[in-house]
UniProtKB/Swiss-Prot annotation:
Quaternary organization: Interacts with MinD and FtsZ.
Keywords: Cell cycle, Cell division, Septation
Family of the protein in this entry: Belongs to the MinC family.
Full protein name: Probable septum site-determining protein MinC
Functional note: Cell division inhibitor that blocks the formation of polar Z ring septums. Rapidly oscillates between the poles of the cell to destabilize FtsZ filaments that have formed before they mature into polar Z rings. Prevents FtsZ polymerization.
Length: 234
């Protein structure tokens, strides 16, 4: 019997989800272009899933949609929360259909812009990285804090559903509160980041290069924006 050369295992990966509210692909292209221009490296090659929960008809051109996403350097993985007909059309366009259990279909489209968000407190022990997160690497601490005892290099990305603690220099990207925990913080010993994000609010390098650039800081969300303050050293 020959030696087994593969093994199939389940795993978890971080995917961006595009919540689509219109079938107008041209308008989507315009708005995506503006969004991507704010942080082009952050979205480059990012795997993305299109959430169809708010699309109530079958007029969406999935071939055009897939082409648009790939043209903008996304990796179009598939769709979720669509109708059977939408899923059939998506498959014909070369998109996968994913089950997305975190989304609950609403009975009707809500007209009020305010949405209730239930925060999930992180209880699991922190995930600790004993060293530097190097360029091209991505670390995700699911349902917990992330502690990096070294630096986060350019082109590296650290993500946590809770807080992110970096005991070295943050040169790459740090994302805290990835599942909507708005009270998450990012702490780092030296701020030189490409991007920081908390609960979906993010700043890129140009916005960070102020008085706290190169310093030890904590970053938190206040009033739907980010706030940076110096870490007090005892």
């Amino acid at each position: 019997m020959s030696e087994q050369i593969f093994e199939l295992k389940g795993n978890l990966f971080t995917l961006s989800v595009l919540h689509l509210y219109s079938t107008d692909i041209n308008l989507l292209a315009e708005q995506l272009y503006i969004k991507i221009a704010q942080a082009p490296k952050f979205f480059e090659g990012a795997p993305i899933v299109v959430n169809l929960i708010e699309i109530k008809n079958n007029s969406l051109d999935f071939v055009h949609l897939k082409s648009l996403l790939e043209r903008m350097s996304f990796n179009a993985v598939g769709v979720c929360n669509g109708s059977d007909e939408q899923h059939t059309q998506a498959k014909a366009a070369g998109l996968s259909v994913l089950n997305y259990s975190q989304d609950v279909k609403s009975e009707s489209v809500k007209k009020e812009p305010n949405t209730s968000i239930v925060e999930k407190t992180v209880h699991l022990p922190a995930q600790i990285i004993n060293g530097t997160v190097r360029s091209g690497q991505q670390v995700y601490a699911k349902d917990r804090d992330l502690v990096v005892l070294g630096a986060v290099s350019h082109g590296a990305e650290v993500i946590a559903d809770g807080n992110v603690h970096i005991y070295g220099t943050l040169r790459g990207r740090a994302i805290a509160g990835a599942k909507g925990f708005k009270n998450a913080h990012i702490f780092c010993n030296r701020l030189e980041a490409e991007l920081v994000s908390i609960n979906g609010n993010y700043w890129i390098s140009d916005s960070l290069q102020g008085e706290h650039w190169g310093s030890a800081v904590q970053i938190q969300q206040k009033n739907e924006s980010l706030e940076i303050s110096a870490l007090v050293k005892g």
